[in-house]
């Protein structure tokens, strides 16, 4: 992040102007760092709220925040941790899960006990087999890695043919990755997978990437950043219609007709939404990263009924219910109070939910969750479905680079377009696709590059 010591923009006759499109974590992080450097910043957000794909709900469980979007934070997410410390946000570590009591459902068969404990262990061995390739990857610029083009040309499915382990272990590993990376394995770049593993610290990627939740809800970080930026610099309900880069100053036109001029424009909205933007000169296709599909189903139950059967709420399947865990912060004080069983599905599993009506989704949830956690349908009280690909200003889960895109698209995103349009967000963060860290980190890094471009500040390396 940018250091406090800086050459103030006041030394310039006129401070540079930057318009940032999107008030998700990427946009807010970039705006906050640029404001500290003395840049005149305007953040435009189409929605009536801050946070983008981070949305903390307080209506499902009493006195708790439940995440309808991005949820888990890693010990290997330095920007998130730095902001949490700076703004006084408490992070709670998730309890360890006992593999023997965390069900896996594969090929229609529910596994428990010693069989599932052995499968969890074997699954881990399969995943760790990619670490050797990941150690060769340049974390900041994976397209410069040895054999980058060849690794990028491979799909994850092709690379998986070299995995060790039994067929069942490989199937479980692929189910986990397909959900986590919201990807279809045959359409997901192997280099993108390796870049994520490398960015997370190789071995640490598997053990430290999803271990914390924010006690006050992840959206509290968005609010903290917004307060630091200043309310006057953020405009909600302000969708952008066009970006014109042909003159000396960039011009951003809102749907309302308002026109803003800027020395630079930062686009943080996901690439899946760019069809709604008219960019002049037109943005080449090689700037657009592929995105995947992800959904969440938040199920309020009358109490954590699974404990009576000595089950953990963490599960993995090869069906529509991709993965489950217990949601809600702060942690429960009583075993009798209502709880949230969260379903997360990515890739093909997510599509199964999106293709159904609300009534069909409820039926699907009851059917599959009753298999994993017998009695679920008797205990469920409320269900909230969040289909991010159906949300107007999102249209996706998160980035899922196709074969060839890491070496082709990422260098272009890092370089910008027409020397005026720049990019930040998880889609522009090769080490943290799909994570909040991707937005926060890419926003802060871009702010540093722009500050140097404007001759404003030095950069403090995290």
In which residue ranges do the predicted regions lie?
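FAD-dinucleotide binding site
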Residues: 1-462
